[in-house]
Amino acid sequence: MTTHAAAPSTRVLIVDDSAAARAMFKVIVESDPALQVMAAVPDAFAAARAMRTELPDVILLDLELPSMDGLTFLRKIMQQHPIPVVVCSSHVGAGTEAMVSALELGAREVISKPAARNDLERQEASIRICDAIRAATETTRRRSQPEPRPLAPGPKLTADEILPARPPRPVPETMPVVCIGASTGGTEALRDVLTALPASAPPIVIVQHMPRGFTAAFARRLDSLCAIEVLEAEDEMQVMPGRAIIAQGDRHLLLRRRNQGYRVSVLDGAYVCRHRPSVDVLFRSAAQEAGGNALGVIMTGMGDDGARCMAEMRAAGAETIAQNEESCVVYGMPREAVAHGGVGKVEPLDRLAARIMEFGRRHTERTVR
């Protein structure tokens, strides 16, 4: 009888100055049989000593550290040992700019340190942290199929919780509008797309999975780099050419038609596909409000958020594009969108900006005839 060796566990180095946080992260990491704690240390110097003996597969890093701050340590890691890093911090107010800097320095993911006020929140936090750690290794291992989650999550809610489904209905011609959904790897991918767009780009509405407090700084940073205007969403904000609106962290974003144009709604509510904001919620609102006036783009990310409601967009007459596997950090959401029949075209990351502009031109030519 042939025996098969178990797949090696992903070794995680935890770096956090709080003993309580280290203990919490150890329990979370060890709850996933695909992960193991290599070491849990209080500062960057202890982490460096641990790494002289053994290199981890992923580092779970707090930014607020004694002696050497987390950003400085992250910069040194990327220069000397480019190991996947997941930043996990509770500093989402004054530290928000630092979080965006962490992404630019090469952190694979930035997540908020869980409050864990009840059992459900602890369970959801465990799933998010383990997913982030597992996703951080995807670019190295190039898995196209995510491994099954070992944790038993609570009920996975659909967009029906926020916006009831309805059959496709004809909608009047309006301005074109582009709806984009992204998750793991999306911050860098969105920067690549948005910085390639001219000021004449069609209106864009974006859901990027990020926690509360991160998206304002993310939008400001993109706004400083782009020819288009990039803003964090506010309720009833006008959607207009040359503007990209990014969903607030921890709030759903919906598209609403107003005469020949659009505004956005910012809503609280249940997690959909275990996310708030949810791509499915945005895409369903686009299917119902914009129909064939919309382009849906689903980009790199783990899981299936956006897949079901991208199919609704396509059924309502929208054009739809998925980022291709080769250019994704994690080929999860695009793969699921293809599987659900919601994708009209598959394109590499470096072609998405051109496709957005082509859509805008085609739609404008169609409406002026």
Swiss-Prot record:
It comes from the Bacteria. The keyword Cytoplasm applies. It comes from Cereibacter sphaeroides. It holds the Pfam family Response_reg. InterPro entries: CheB-like, CheB_C, CheY-like_superfamily, Sig_transdc_resp-reg_Me-estase, Sig_transdc_resp-reg_receiver. It catalyses: [protein]-L-glutamate 5-O-methyl ester + H2O = L-glutamyl-[protein] + methanol + H(+); L-glutaminyl-[protein] + H2O = L-glutamyl-[protein] + NH4(+). Keywords: Chemotaxis, Cytoplasm, Hydrolase, Phosphoprotein. This is Protein-glutamate methylesterase/protein-glutamine glutaminase of group 3 operon. Contains a C-terminal catalytic domain, and an N-terminal region which modulates catalytic activity. R.sphaeroides does not have a cheB in its group 1 operon. Part of the third chemotactic pathway (cheOp3); there are 3 operons encoding multiple homologs of the chemosensory proteins in R.sphaeroides. This locus, and cheB2, are essential for chemotaxis. CheB2 is not involved in phototaxis signaling. This protein is able to partially complement an E.coli cheB deletion mutant. Belongs to the CheB family. The modification 4-aspartylphosphate is found at residue 62. Its EC number is 3.1.1.61, 3.5.1.44. Gene3D superfamilies: 3.40.50.2300, Methylesterase CheB, C-terminal domain. Residues 136-168 are annotated as: Disordered. Involved in chemotaxis. Part of a chemotaxis signal transduction system that modulates chemotaxis in response to various stimuli. Catalyzes the demethylation of specific methylglutamate residues introduced into the chemoreceptors (methyl-accepting chemotaxis proteins or MCP) by CheR. Also mediates the irreversible deamidation of specific glutamine residues to glutamic acid. One of its GO terms (molecular function) is protein-glutamate methylesterase activity. Residues 11-128 form the Response regulatory domain. The keyword Lipid biosynthesis does not apply. Phosphorylated in vitro by CheA2, but not by CheA1. Phosphorylation of the N-terminal regulatory domain activates the methylesterase activity. The active site is at residues 183, 209, 305. Residues 170-358 form the CheB-type methylesterase domain. It is found in: Cytoplasm. One of its GO terms (cellular component) is cytoplasm. GO terms for biological process: chemotaxis.
